[in-house]
């Protein structure tokens, strides 16, 4: 039976009674098989598995995007129970931000590129909430998908910079059969948009250059924020209708 704990103090009281290793999967809910893969990895390698569900307002720079973020609590709980998750931490905004976000964690170089250039303040919100979650949960290992590769890299950097005693475990992107990266935002695509969406993965995989991939997507009706090569990885963000999709591949 999965325990559901609402406040940091309630969770910490539970956590103090536990022994052994803790695998942690932080999420914003609307769970899909990509999240399930993170949970399975955590289950395989730890004594206890903790899942958090918190739609974090400080990482949304568009209030409409926050309002439209899908919430699927019953399905999320069913997935947690199916995968033997020991506890779900399911806090509210005042629980997580007693300071109303006066204190924050920020990184001032890599967080300004790629998604950071298009979503001001986004990564401050991500790093701040993840730091809070790590402090409450005190995990041995925390699991993050490579789909959000920039986020993963920034969190790894934060853990190293602040000497945090846990291991970050990257998990490869889980894709639909047609190549589209699994994402909670995919639920918001219309049937027509859903048919078009795999073009993102095809463009960044098959194009010789980032510019060629961007041109291909624009020609197919996507509004492209960026296609950029950084090191040995190609990153993309593009809008299809109302939905902004991101992906990346090794090149």
From Swiss-Prot:
Keyword Membrane attributed: no
Record organism: Bdellovibrio bacteriovorus (strain ATCC 15356 / DSM 50701 / NCIMB 9529 / HD100)
Protein name: Pantothenate synthetase
Further details from the record: The reaction proceeds by a bi uni uni bi ping pong mechanism.
GO biological process, one term: pantothenate biosynthetic process
Pfam families for the chain: Pantoate_ligase
Pathway given in the UniProt record: Cofactor biosynthesis; (R)-pantothenate biosynthesis; (R)-pantothenate from (R)-pantoate and beta-alanine: step 1/1
Lineage of the organism: Bacteria, Pseudomonadati, Bdellovibrionota, Bdellovibrionia, Bdellovibrionales
Annotated positions binding (R)-pantoate: 59, 151
Family named by the database record: Belongs to the pantothenate synthetase family.
